[in-house]
Structures are given as structure tokens and as C-alpha cells.
């Protein structure tokens, strides 16, 4: 009985110490906040690493929809409509998903953005916008998944996704000029 009473405080101390240990995530959180023209755009995602693996075709199978990251849903939020060619992504927050193949990718902006990873059941009616991009083969390896907003202009930019030796780009435009003119007229 005495041994149990002596061990009890040590058990509590051990539990307390374990509760205070913080470990880094295998796929750390990444977040971009970018002003493009008058639009505020943010993308939050987890950044898995290559870790000496073959990423596309193995870790991320070709022809299957992927959650574009790890852990929580990858999300994009925009305060202005984004115009991708003839298609418009309306103001809001979307889950981002991709379907890579050997030569091109499809990128999906999904209206449901609160789930963890892939939706339990994919619903095409929740795809707000579907885009395609040819693959750009890189000469150097990008160790961690990287999503960026590049080629910034007054009324345009590019969402770029890079990992391993692959890059895809999705250029978009904004209606900045008419908003500025309307502001001047006020």
C-alpha cells in the first residue's frame, strides 16, 4: 500500500510533463495573405514534405482527387471575384482540391470548406469552379508543398502550386479598374 502511495505523485508528475511537451507537425501549417489590386486573398494549408518519396503517382496517385495538402482542409478566401479566363470565382471561402495526372492538373474550388481532408462523399454540385493547368517540370526539387500567389499586377496574379519537381499555375484577373473608377466618381 505504501508503494502505491509513493508512486501516485510520480504518476501525476509524468502526466503533467507529457501534457506540456509540444512537438512540431510533420506537415506544418502554411498561410499566405496577399493583396492583389483591391482584393484580399488568403490561402491556408498544411505543407507535407517529399521525404525521399516519389510524390506524384505514388504518395498522391494520378487521376484521384486529392485534398491539396495534409491535415485540415486547404482553404482559399477572397474578398473580390477572381476571373480565371471565362470563369469567375465569387467572393467567399472555398476548400481547394486537385486531381493531378502526368501531364496536367485539375484544381477544384469546393463550396464546403470545413471538413477535414476529403469530403466524406464528393458532391459535384459543390464545385464552384474547376480549372485545368499543364504541368511545368522543374529542374530542382521543392521539398515541401508550396502554394503561392505570384506575378502580382494591378489587376492580376497567379496561384502557383509547387511540390517535388512539379509546378502548376492558375492565372486570374480582377475587375480593379471599374472599382477604382466607381470610387473616384463617389
Listing of model-derived features with the role each one plays in the protein:
Residues 1-22:
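Bacterial Sec-dependent N-terminal signal peptides
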Residues 8, 44, 77, 97, ...:
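Beta-strand residues in well-ordered beta-sheet regions across diverse protein folds
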Residues 15-16, 90, 155:
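Generic detector of short, well-ordered, non-transmembrane alpha-helical segments enriched
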Residues 20-61, 113-185:
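Primarily secretory-pathway and cell-envelope proteins
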Residues 57-73:
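Aromatic- and Gly/Pro-rich amphipathic surface segment
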Residues 69-114:
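Mid-length scaffold segments of soluble, non-membrane domains
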